[in-house]
Protein backbone atom coordinates (compact mmCIF):
# COMPACT_ATOMS: atom_id res chain seq x y z
CA UNK A 1 0.00 0.00 0.00
CA UNK A 2 1.30 3.47 -0.87
CA UNK A 3 0.91 6.56 1.32
CA UNK A 4 1.60 10.10 0.17
CA UNK A 5 2.86 12.52 2.82
CA UNK A 6 4.45 15.95 2.96
CA UNK A 7 7.45 17.03 5.00
CA UNK A 8 6.85 20.72 4.37
CA UNK A 9 9.27 21.01 1.47
CA UNK A 10 8.28 18.30 -1.00
CA UNK A 11 5.79 15.50 -1.53
CA UNK A 12 7.03 12.04 -0.56
CA UNK A 13 5.70 8.54 -1.05
CA UNK A 14 6.03 5.90 1.67
CA UNK A 15 5.79 2.34 0.48
CA UNK A 16 5.03 -0.25 3.16
CA UNK A 17 6.14 -3.74 2.24
CA UNK A 18 5.84 -6.82 4.45
CA UNK A 19 9.16 -7.82 6.00
CA UNK A 20 11.23 -5.12 4.33
CA UNK A 21 10.34 -2.03 6.37
CA UNK A 22 9.71 1.35 4.77
CA UNK A 23 11.14 2.90 1.64
CA UNK A 24 10.73 6.66 1.16
CA UNK A 25 11.31 8.40 -2.15
CA UNK A 26 10.23 11.52 -3.99
CA UNK A 27 6.97 11.42 -5.87
CA UNK A 28 7.20 12.01 -9.60
CA UNK A 29 3.89 10.47 -10.59
CA UNK A 30 0.21 11.01 -9.87
CA UNK A 31 -2.39 8.24 -9.87
CA UNK A 32 -5.43 10.34 -8.99
CA UNK A 33 -6.12 13.59 -7.24
CA UNK A 34 -8.98 15.36 -5.52
CA UNK A 35 -9.79 18.88 -6.80
CA UNK A 36 -7.21 21.52 -5.92
CA UNK A 37 -8.75 24.85 -5.02
CA UNK A 38 -7.35 28.20 -4.00
CA UNK A 39 -8.05 28.20 -0.27
CA UNK A 40 -5.98 31.14 1.05
CA UNK A 41 -5.65 34.77 0.01
CA UNK A 42 -1.87 34.52 -0.36
CA UNK A 43 -1.89 31.26 -2.30
CA UNK A 44 -0.98 31.06 -5.95
CA UNK A 45 -3.06 29.81 -8.83
CA UNK A 46 -4.91 26.50 -8.49
CA UNK A 47 -2.98 23.45 -9.69
CA UNK A 48 -4.24 20.40 -11.54
CA UNK A 49 -2.64 17.89 -9.16
CA UNK A 50 -1.69 18.07 -5.47
CA UNK A 51 1.64 19.56 -4.45
CA UNK A 52 3.29 19.58 -1.03
CA UNK A 53 1.77 22.99 -0.21
CA UNK A 54 -1.42 22.92 -2.28
CA UNK A 55 -3.85 20.08 -1.61
CA UNK A 56 -7.58 20.03 -0.96
CA UNK A 57 -7.96 17.11 1.48
CA UNK A 58 -5.98 15.34 4.20
CA UNK A 59 -6.37 11.62 4.91
CA UNK A 60 -7.75 11.45 8.45
CA UNK A 61 -8.96 7.85 8.87
CA UNK A 62 -8.63 4.41 7.25
CA UNK A 63 -10.72 1.34 7.98
CA UNK A 64 -10.31 -2.13 6.52
CA UNK A 65 -12.79 -4.99 6.25
CA UNK A 66 -11.99 -8.62 5.50
CA UNK A 67 -14.53 -10.48 3.39
CA UNK A 68 -14.31 -14.27 3.74
CA UNK A 69 -14.40 -16.01 0.39
CA UNK A 70 -12.51 -18.54 -1.68
CA UNK A 71 -9.97 -15.81 -2.27
CA UNK A 72 -9.75 -13.55 0.78
CA UNK A 73 -10.72 -9.99 -0.08
CA UNK A 74 -9.65 -6.89 1.84
CA UNK A 75 -11.76 -3.74 1.42
CA UNK A 76 -10.50 -0.32 2.48
CA UNK A 77 -12.46 2.86 3.19
CA UNK A 78 -10.90 6.29 3.53
CA UNK A 79 -12.11 9.42 5.37
CA UNK A 80 -10.82 12.82 4.30
CA UNK A 81 -10.66 16.19 6.05
CA UNK A 82 -10.74 19.35 3.95
CA UNK A 83 -7.50 21.30 4.12
CA UNK A 84 -9.31 24.50 5.13
CA UNK A 85 -10.16 22.96 8.52
CA UNK A 86 -7.81 24.19 11.23
CA UNK A 87 -7.71 24.41 15.05
CA UNK A 88 -8.18 28.20 14.96
CA UNK A 89 -11.51 28.08 13.09
CA UNK A 90 -10.16 30.55 10.54
CA UNK A 91 -12.79 32.65 8.76
CA UNK A 92 -11.76 33.31 5.16
CA UNK A 93 -12.56 36.51 3.27
CA UNK A 94 -12.95 34.97 -0.20
CA UNK A 95 -14.76 31.71 0.61
CA UNK A 96 -17.83 30.66 2.53
CA UNK A 97 -16.45 29.29 5.80
CA UNK A 98 -18.24 26.38 7.48
CA UNK A 99 -17.51 25.67 11.14
CA UNK A 100 -19.10 22.60 12.78
CA UNK A 101 -21.04 23.53 15.91
CA UNK A 102 -19.25 20.78 17.84
CA UNK A 103 -16.06 22.86 17.64
CA UNK A 104 -17.60 25.06 20.34
CA UNK A 105 -15.18 25.58 23.23
CA UNK A 106 -17.92 26.18 25.81
CA UNK A 107 -21.34 24.57 26.35
CA UNK A 108 -24.11 25.54 28.74
CA UNK A 109 -25.11 23.06 31.43
CA UNK A 110 -28.29 22.06 29.58
CA UNK A 111 -26.75 21.79 26.10
CA UNK A 112 -24.86 18.70 24.97
CA UNK A 113 -23.24 16.99 22.00
CA UNK A 114 -25.35 14.26 20.39
CA UNK A 115 -24.59 11.77 17.66
CA UNK A 116 -25.30 12.98 14.15
CA UNK A 117 -27.68 11.16 11.77
CA UNK A 118 -24.85 10.07 9.47
CA UNK A 119 -25.16 12.66 6.68
CA UNK A 120 -23.96 15.78 8.52
CA UNK A 121 -20.30 14.79 8.59
CA UNK A 122 -20.20 14.63 12.38
CA UNK A 123 -22.07 15.15 15.62
CA UNK A 124 -24.52 17.92 16.53
CA UNK A 125 -25.18 20.25 19.45
CA UNK A 126 -28.49 19.75 21.24
CA UNK A 127 -28.95 23.46 21.93
CA UNK A 128 -30.84 24.17 25.17
CA UNK A 129 -29.25 27.28 26.68
CA UNK A 130 -25.98 28.62 25.22
CA UNK A 131 -22.66 27.75 23.61
CA UNK A 132 -19.57 29.68 22.49
CA UNK A 133 -17.28 29.28 19.49
CA UNK A 134 -13.95 31.10 19.16
CA UNK A 135 -12.71 31.95 15.67
CA UNK A 136 -9.77 33.70 14.02
CA UNK A 137 -10.41 36.14 11.20
CA UNK A 138 -7.94 36.17 8.29
CA UNK A 139 -5.72 39.11 7.44
CA UNK A 140 -8.20 41.33 5.54
CA UNK A 141 -11.21 43.35 6.71
CA UNK A 142 -14.46 41.87 5.46
CA UNK A 143 -18.23 41.95 6.06
CA UNK A 144 -20.26 38.75 6.34
CA UNK A 145 -23.72 37.30 6.59
CA UNK A 146 -23.88 34.62 9.29
CA UNK A 147 -26.23 31.67 9.05
CA UNK A 148 -26.77 28.35 10.81
CA UNK A 149 -27.75 24.90 9.61
CA UNK A 150 -30.16 23.42 12.11
CA UNK A 151 -33.13 21.16 12.79
CA UNK A 152 -36.00 22.03 15.13
CA UNK A 153 -39.37 20.53 16.04
CA UNK A 154 -40.99 23.75 17.26
CA UNK A 155 -44.45 24.68 16.05
CA UNK A 156 -45.71 28.04 14.83
CA UNK A 157 -46.59 28.91 18.44
CA UNK A 158 -43.52 27.40 20.14
CA UNK A 159 -40.69 28.49 17.89
CA UNK A 160 -37.23 28.64 19.39
CA UNK A 161 -35.57 32.07 19.40
CA UNK A 162 -31.80 32.46 19.40
CA UNK A 163 -29.53 35.46 19.92
CA UNK A 164 -25.93 35.83 18.77
CA UNK A 165 -23.54 38.05 20.73
CA UNK A 166 -20.21 39.14 19.21
CA UNK A 167 -17.97 41.73 20.95
CA UNK A 168 -18.18 45.06 19.11
CA UNK A 169 -21.24 43.99 17.10
CA UNK A 170 -24.90 44.75 17.82
CA UNK A 171 -26.69 41.64 19.09
CA UNK A 172 -28.36 39.54 16.41
CA UNK A 173 -31.51 37.49 16.85
CA UNK A 174 -33.99 35.35 14.94
CA UNK A 175 -36.83 32.87 15.42
CA UNK A 176 -36.30 29.38 14.01
CA UNK A 177 -38.78 27.81 11.64
CA UNK A 178 -39.79 24.23 12.54
CA UNK A 179 -38.15 21.65 10.26
CA UNK A 180 -39.41 18.30 11.58
CA UNK A 181 -42.18 16.94 13.80
CA UNK A 182 -42.13 14.58 16.75
CA UNK A 183 -39.55 14.20 19.50
CA UNK A 184 -37.26 11.54 17.99
CA UNK A 185 -34.21 13.22 16.47
CA UNK A 186 -32.01 10.11 16.20
CA UNK A 187 -32.96 9.37 12.59
CA UNK A 188 -33.36 12.76 10.95
CA UNK A 189 -33.27 12.98 7.16
CA UNK A 190 -31.34 15.48 5.06
CA UNK A 191 -34.57 17.39 4.38
CA UNK A 192 -35.11 17.86 8.13
CA UNK A 193 -32.26 20.40 8.24
CA UNK A 194 -32.53 23.97 7.01
CA UNK A 195 -30.44 27.13 6.79
CA UNK A 196 -31.48 30.35 8.47
CA UNK A 197 -29.57 33.60 8.24
CA UNK A 198 -29.31 36.50 10.67
CA UNK A 199 -30.71 39.58 8.95
CA UNK A 200 -27.88 42.02 9.69
CA UNK A 201 -24.37 41.83 8.32
CA UNK A 202 -21.28 41.91 10.55
CA UNK A 203 -17.80 43.29 9.88
CA UNK A 204 -14.58 41.75 11.20
CA UNK A 205 -11.20 43.47 11.43
CA UNK A 206 -7.99 41.85 10.09
CA UNK A 207 -6.53 39.09 12.29
CA UNK A 208 -9.31 39.58 14.85
CA UNK A 209 -9.99 36.93 17.48
CA UNK A 210 -13.76 36.49 17.57
CA UNK A 211 -15.99 34.93 20.21
CA UNK A 212 -19.52 34.04 19.11
CA UNK A 213 -21.96 33.31 21.92
CA UNK A 214 -25.29 31.74 20.94
CA UNK A 215 -28.14 31.98 23.46
CA UNK A 216 -31.69 30.66 23.44
CA UNK A 217 -34.08 33.37 24.58
CA UNK A 218 -37.37 31.46 24.30
CA UNK A 219 -39.15 29.67 27.13
CA UNK A 220 -40.11 26.54 25.19
CA UNK A 221 -37.66 24.13 26.81
CA UNK A 222 -39.35 21.14 25.17
CA UNK A 223 -38.60 22.49 21.70
CA UNK A 224 -35.57 20.68 20.29
CA UNK A 225 -32.91 22.67 18.44
CA UNK A 226 -30.01 20.77 16.87
CA UNK A 227 -27.18 22.90 15.46
CA UNK A 228 -25.08 21.34 12.70
CA UNK A 229 -22.79 24.19 11.66
CA UNK A 230 -22.28 27.93 11.44
CA UNK A 231 -21.44 29.54 8.11
CA UNK A 232 -19.84 32.89 7.27
CA UNK A 233 -20.71 34.24 3.81
CA UNK A 234 -18.34 37.02 2.65
CA UNK A 235 -20.36 39.91 1.22
CA UNK A 236 -19.21 40.71 -2.30
CA UNK A 237 -20.69 43.26 -4.67
CA UNK A 238 -22.61 40.58 -6.58
CA UNK A 239 -24.06 39.10 -3.38
CA UNK A 240 -25.15 42.53 -2.16
CA UNK A 241 -26.81 43.32 -5.49
CA UNK A 242 -28.58 39.95 -5.47
CA UNK A 243 -29.85 40.51 -1.92
CA UNK A 244 -31.17 43.96 -2.85
CA UNK A 245 -32.95 42.47 -5.85
CA UNK A 246 -34.56 39.80 -3.65
CA UNK A 247 -35.64 42.47 -1.17
CA UNK A 248 -37.28 44.56 -3.90
CA UNK A 249 -39.11 41.51 -5.24
CA UNK A 250 -40.39 40.69 -1.74
CA UNK A 251 -41.61 44.26 -1.20
CA UNK A 252 -43.32 44.20 -4.59
CA UNK A 253 -45.14 40.98 -3.69
CA UNK A 254 -46.32 42.53 -0.41
CA UNK A 255 -47.48 45.70 -2.15
CA UNK A 256 -49.40 43.64 -4.71
CA UNK A 257 -51.46 42.14 -1.89
CA UNK A 258 -52.70 45.64 -1.00
CA UNK A 259 -54.57 46.03 -4.25
CA UNK A 260 -58.06 44.68 -4.76
CA UNK A 261 -57.36 44.83 -8.50
CA UNK A 262 -53.61 45.08 -9.28
CA UNK A 263 -54.31 45.83 -12.95
CA UNK A 264 -56.34 48.93 -12.08
CA UNK A 265 -54.15 49.80 -9.06
CA UNK A 266 -57.21 49.93 -6.80
CA UNK A 267 -56.30 49.87 -3.10
CA UNK A 268 -58.24 47.69 -0.68
CA UNK A 269 -60.76 49.73 1.29
CA UNK A 270 -59.54 48.48 4.71
CA UNK A 271 -55.86 49.32 4.01
CA UNK A 272 -54.22 51.66 6.56
CA UNK A 273 -51.19 53.96 6.43
CA UNK A 274 -49.51 51.66 8.96
CA UNK A 275 -49.73 48.70 6.55
CA UNK A 276 -48.05 50.72 3.82
CA UNK A 277 -45.29 51.94 6.17
CA UNK A 278 -44.58 48.38 7.32
CA UNK A 279 -44.21 47.21 3.72
CA UNK A 280 -41.80 50.04 2.99
CA UNK A 281 -39.64 49.04 5.94
Curated annotation (Swiss-Prot):
The keyword Ligase does not apply. GO terms for biological process: sporulation resulting in formation of a cellular spore. Residues 54-78, 91-104, 108-116, 131-148, 160-172, 189-196, 208-216, 221-236, 247-256 are annotated as: Antigenic epitope. One of its GO terms (molecular function) is signaling receptor binding. Keywords: Sporulation, Toxin, Virulence. InterPro entries: Galactose-bd-like_sf (IPR008979), Pest_crys_dom-III (IPR005638), Pest_cryst_cen_dom_sf (IPR036399), Pest_cryst_dom_II (IPR001178). Signal peptide: none annotated. Belongs to the delta endotoxin family. Promotes colloidosmotic lysis by binding to the midgut epithelial cells of insects. Active against Mamestra brassicae. This is Insecticidal crystal toxin protein. The lineage of its organism: Bacteria, Bacillati, Bacillota, Bacilli, Bacillales.
Amino acid sequence: MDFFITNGTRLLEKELTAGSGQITYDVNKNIFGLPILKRRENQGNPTLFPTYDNYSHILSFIKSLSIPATYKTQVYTFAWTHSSVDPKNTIYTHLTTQIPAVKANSLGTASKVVQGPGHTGGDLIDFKDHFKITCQHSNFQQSYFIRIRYASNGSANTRAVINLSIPGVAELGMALNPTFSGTDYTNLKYKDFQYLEFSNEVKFAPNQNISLVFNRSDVYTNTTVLIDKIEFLPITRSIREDREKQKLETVQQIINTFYANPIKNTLQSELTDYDIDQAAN
